């Protein structure tokens, strides 16, 4: 039995109260912006019912940890915390007090111990406080906010006709939104907590029907969610648990106005969890607008760095040499494992994929011009191993959760070091080892110094010619490059 109160602990508490009938839908679009309407909205908010959001009871095992033990544990797992009255981390799943059905799913998934972000993030989230989480992709952050969300829903009154969701998760891309929803379905099924995924590029009908039936958890991209609200298909009056996942990526994609519009329609006493892989000033400023007295947990460093489980190899070459180098590399590493190749443009993605297929390689491509059905099919073929080579633009760089990607190849160097780190982060997930290969040309020279910093921080070898580029020297001519092969990650890949 969980240590939470009865409603939060027992899956039957929500299951028994949850009707199978249709009762969702929306009755309220975005509020007008006049002062009179704003005042009316504030008065309306004052009449909203109270809700529960603090469910954490420290286990005897956690309570017994001394300050020295807490500090040693955080230091060993590279956990940095900020905030008032920060709870101690949990070292085992049973210390969290999750409902039994959640623990069963955790066991079934084969998890051995909480990841660092889960270890510290779960007690913070379950206390009902706002939370800033800074952790690299693949750190386990999705469950760090989803499992407390399930506990939160279980403690709330059931949805009534016309109610919108209780939990809202905003994500930058449909791929990430779909993956989050898959986890929500897996861990929420036993308590009849229902979720849906709202994103553009597909017909609205099935999404509208889900909203009208009533769902406790909505995972959405900002644009399609605004469309649904303004069309009166849902509302945000019941949202008391808000998650912004990959906030840095959403800002990169220009979603700040949409995020502000959405958040302005949610009651201010909500709980907000704000997740980002990096912490630039614009991400911090947005957090200041939305969060109150938050905890902050950082896994590793706020400085941009790559996963140390990834072996990084950088090859200096010319644009005209890339394709032959790619083929030579594939001949060397192809063993049936999944290989993800990143391009800068949709056109380049299609061209290289077409050439690879003509040369007999089992390659497919995914990018923003593909229909959702095409993208789903390509991902399915890649995940199953039927087509173990997938080329992609950055639409797949964030949040793409494909197990056992052994190799990432940056055919084109991305437009930022943040995207470089996120691209190569598709491999080396969940404690596995991975390998990333990067083609680096004279046109990328402005990134050399920062790339060297990332390589050195991760203990990777830096080639003399990349080091020279980092000092501002021009790249060597192609006729002199062979003697530098093999640097950048510690082994030859010629």
From Swiss-Prot:
Query: What molecular functions are annotated in GO for this chain?
Result: ATP binding; ATP hydrolysis activity; mRNA binding; RNA helicase activity
**EC number(s) per entry:** 3.6.4.13
Q: Which UniProt keywords apply?
A: ATP-binding, Helicase, Hydrolase, Nonsense-mediated mRNA decay, Nucleotide-binding, Nucleus, Ribosome biogenesis, RNA-binding, rRNA processing
Task: Output one GO BP term.
Answer: nuclear-transcribed mRNA catabolic process, nonsense-mediated decay
Q: Residue ranges for motif Q motif?
A: 91-119
- What is catalyzed by this enzyme? ATP + H2O = ADP + phosphate + H(+)
Basic and acidic residues bias: start-end ranges: 1-20
Give the domain section of the comments.
The Q motif is unique to and characteristic of the DEAD box family of RNA helicases and controls ATP binding and hydrolysis.
Protein name (record): DEAD-box ATP-dependent RNA helicase 20
